[in-house]
């Protein structure tokens, strides 16, 4: 460890969002470069910093600061420079010179203890004197707060958030109930609060601790796709987390109900527990769906005549179910169209669009992801947006301590949709594709922006994996039998020529897939050992498939069922990166969390970031479009890494350029190989899938079905045929607790009683 004490000569770089700075500090005639997070610092201040001396490949020796303390300038020249740096609003270089000339080394004491005397200086009024004193006091309080919070292991960034939220009240919060931080501050979850509580001396059986841990365990379940948990399962999870017996939790469950943080219901004679926000999302979603579910009488013969004109003009052939879907779309306010690959969903959507266009209706198209929206645009010839863009996601982050759904770790933080019940979407017809990916939060937001009387048509394959986020929306809606549903089942002639589509249906039906059959688009290469599987996958991706499917190597995707193991994404990505994008002297790279990110790497966003900004540039580098938000599953290529500014730039679909600070790299992972779960809503020219032994809960029919249906031109499976067939035979589905079906049936029952 090394220590540098001196004056901040110059702030060479500063990120105002997170306080990361590069400082030039003079210590005994020597210049040192300090890098780190400094929430509040100004040129001219005296700093004592401790950290590690590191050698930067471009910028030379630097002190990576781990802790520091700001000290008052000791001589009049330093005081004058500090005051004239802009650190105190209202004081420029000339006024700083007059103040220091008047009070000399006593300047800071005067500012703190006798601020009215500042009015003795020409150009300083009594009011200005008080404002200067207030600023000095605020900076002193902030620094004291930083020192106090850092003794509890709180990072500089979190310390700033805590102080800005509570002010001086933070001391009592930390010492009396640090678990309050998990409710109020983004980035502070239960575990951080629990560590602080242990240092403060709060007992493990504290009411605050049990209540906070119980709620945390419930919120953790939403990360696994659940909107609720059975009470017994919740108590077991919380008991393991807290090391407290389950019988002590009933009282705290009641307390959390009183605080309106959760809702307890009965299902099949047992109690289930919701985070309040998810219960009300389900309830309100059910109500809004019911309101849209209007039926109007139509002249069926007239509709069929119009439909015939459209199909003849557009040279479209519809089967009975597709024709029924069009009739249902005309006569109903809400319609679900579901079916597997090759069953004509796109043709049906196009026909519906043509029909409503002839009625001069305004039509909007959307899908959950950028890739899915792009596919929808290509298939229909009409612009499709992501649902987030359709609803106009916008806003700046704010802290909402009353947000009962706050995990303390992953919130919208004040982001909001401009389109809502007060500013609904201006459309007669809205068509949403890839509905299996839509979670309860997104459907709730969408429905709030849809006027009663607007037709809503939801399209998706119910046999795909459910959404990454909480809920099982499409399946619950269909299972409720409360809405019109058309299930397309016929595989059309052109689609029937594709072994991808034929075999996908065989997989979904649990039939045997012929793996030794010669095929142009569905290939199985037998390899028994992981090392051989990896070797063959590399050859396929680099040498064979790009020419075969006429695609860039980066567009060919390896998908695997698991994260861990020799054929998991973590091990595969390291090997694939070494093969496809090895280190080179001219390639910048950055290590973060055990992963090396290198210019040219393929990466994926692994959590929703609603606030991060993107821009599209023309060939001259001038921005021509901009917006906010990068979402879980978006993939891109690293275009640049700036070690001095500590930023990395990634290009996503549709040429969207996004700048990440190094502290945000935890939101990214390499994407040469991805989990099958992460492939939802995407389509690739070719996919390569390793097939080897793994946990039964992962090696399932709907997982391999999802993987196969992601390929447009070619599927290559490499591994053991018996394992593949075992996956086809394995109907096990991971349990997902979702209550939307029950809420829909409740609403229907209550409406019937009225």
Q: Which ranges hold each PLM region?
A:
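Conserved helicase motor core of P-loop NTPases
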Residues: 462-628
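ASCE P-loop NTPase motor cores of helicases and related translocases
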Residues: 247, 268-429, 478, 484-493, ...
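Short, conserved "post-DEAD/DEAH" coupling segment immediately C-terminal to helicase motif II
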Residues: 440-454, 472-477
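C-terminal accessory regions
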Residues: 625, 632-754
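Short hydrophobic/aromatic beta-strand immediately N-terminal to the Walker A/P-loop
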Residues: 335-338, 457, 557
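Loop/turn-to-beta-strand initiation segments
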Residues: 362, 426-429, 453-457, 714
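Accessory, non-ATPase domains that flank or precede helicase/AAA+ motor cores in DNA-metabolism machines
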Residues: 1-298, 302
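Walker B catalytic acidic pair
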Residues: 434, 460
């Amino acid at each position: 460890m090394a220590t540098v004490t001196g004056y901040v000569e110059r702030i060479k770089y500063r990120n105002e969002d997170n306080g990361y700075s590069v400082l030039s500090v003079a210590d005994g005639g020597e210049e040192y470069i300090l890098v780190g997070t400094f929430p509040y610092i100004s040129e001219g201040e005296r700093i004592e910093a401790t950290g590690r001396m590191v050698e930067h490949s471009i910028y030379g020796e630097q002190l990576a600061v781990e802790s520091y303390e700001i000290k008052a300038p000791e001589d009049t020249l330093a005081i004058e420079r500090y005051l004239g740096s802009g650190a105190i609003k209202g004081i420029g270089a000339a006024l700083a010179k007059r103040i220091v000339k008047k009070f000399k080394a006593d300047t800071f004491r005067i500012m703190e203890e006798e601020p009215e005397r500042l009015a003795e200086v020409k150009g300083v009024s009594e009011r200005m004197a008080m404002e200067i004193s207030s600023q000095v006091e605020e900076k002193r309080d902030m620094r004291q707060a930083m020192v106090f919070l850092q003794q509890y292991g709180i990072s500089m960034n979190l310390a700033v958030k805590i102080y800005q939220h509570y002010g001086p009240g933070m001391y009592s919060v930390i010492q009396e109930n640090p678990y309050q931080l998990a409710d109020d501050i983004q980035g502070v979850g239960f575990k951080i609060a629990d560590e602080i509580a242990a240092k403060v001396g709060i007992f493990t059986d504290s009411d605050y601790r049990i209540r906070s841990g119980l709620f945390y365990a419930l919120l953790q379940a939403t990360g696994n796709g659940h909107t609720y948990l059975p009470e017994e399962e919740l108590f077991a999870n919380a008991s393991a987390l807290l090391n407290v017996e389950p019988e002590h939790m009933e009282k705290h469950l009641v307390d959390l109900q009183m605080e309106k943080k959760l809702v307890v219901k009965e299902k099949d004679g047992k109690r289930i527990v919701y985070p309040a926000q998810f219960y009300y999302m389900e309830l309100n979603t059910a109500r809004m769906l019911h309101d849209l579910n209007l039926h109007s009488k139509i002249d069926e013969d007239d509709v069929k005549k119009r439909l015939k004109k459209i199909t003849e003009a557009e040279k479209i052939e519809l089967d009975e179910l597709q024709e029924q879907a069009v009739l249902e779309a005309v006569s109903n306010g809400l319609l679900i169209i579901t079916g597997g690959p090759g069953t004509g969903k796109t043709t049906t959507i196009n026909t519906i669009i043509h029909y409503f266009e002839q009625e001069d209706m305004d039509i909007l198209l959307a899908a959950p992801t950028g890739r899915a929206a792009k596919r929808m645009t290509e298939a229909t010839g009409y612009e499709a947006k992501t649902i987030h863009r359709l609803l106009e996601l916008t806003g700046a982050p704010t802290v909402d301590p009353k947000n009962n759904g706050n995990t303390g770790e992953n919130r919208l933080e004040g982001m909001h949709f401009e389109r809502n019940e007060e500013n609904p979407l201006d459309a007669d017809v809205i068509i949403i594709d890839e509905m299996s990916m839509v979670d309860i939060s997104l459907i709730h937001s969408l429905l709030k922006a849809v006027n009663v009387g607007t037709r809503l048509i939801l399209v998706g394959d119910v046999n795909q994996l459910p959404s990454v986020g909480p809920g099982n929306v499409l399946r619950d809606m269909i299972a409720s039998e409360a809405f019109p549903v058309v299930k397309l089942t016929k595989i059309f002639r052109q689609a029937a020529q594709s072994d991808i589509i034929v075999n996908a249906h065989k997989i979904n039906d649990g039939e045997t897939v012929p793996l030794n059959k010669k095929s142009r688009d569905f290939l199985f290469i037998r390899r028994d050992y992981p090392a051989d599987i990896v070797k063959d996958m590399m050859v396929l991706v680099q040498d064979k498939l790009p020419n075969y499917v006429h695609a860039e190597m980066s567009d060919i995707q390896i998908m695997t069922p698991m994260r861990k193991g020799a054929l998991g994404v973590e091990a595969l990505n390291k090997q694939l990166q070494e093969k496809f994008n090895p280190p080179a002297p001219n390639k910048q790279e950055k290590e973060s969390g055990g992963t090396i990110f290198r210019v040219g790497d393929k990466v994926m966003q692994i959590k929703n970031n609603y606030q991060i900004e993107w821009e599209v540039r023309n060939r001259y580098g001038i921005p021509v479009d901009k917006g906010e938000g990068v979402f879980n599953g978006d993939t891109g290529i690293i275009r640049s890494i700036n070690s001095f500014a500590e930023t990395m730039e990634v290009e996503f679909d549709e040429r969207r350029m996004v700048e990440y600070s190094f502290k945000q790299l935890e939101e990214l992972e390499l994407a040469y190989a991805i989990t099958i779960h992460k492939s939802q809503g995407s389509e690739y020219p070719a996919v390569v899938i390793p097939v080897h032994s793994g946990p039964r809960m992962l090696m399932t029919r709907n997982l391999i079905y999802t993987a196969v249906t992601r390929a447009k031109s070619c599927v290559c499976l490499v591994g053991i045929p018996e394992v593949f067939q075992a996956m086809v035979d394995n109907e096990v589905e991971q349990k997902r607790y979702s209550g939307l079906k029950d809420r829909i049936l409740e609403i229907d029952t209550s409406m019937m009683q009225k």
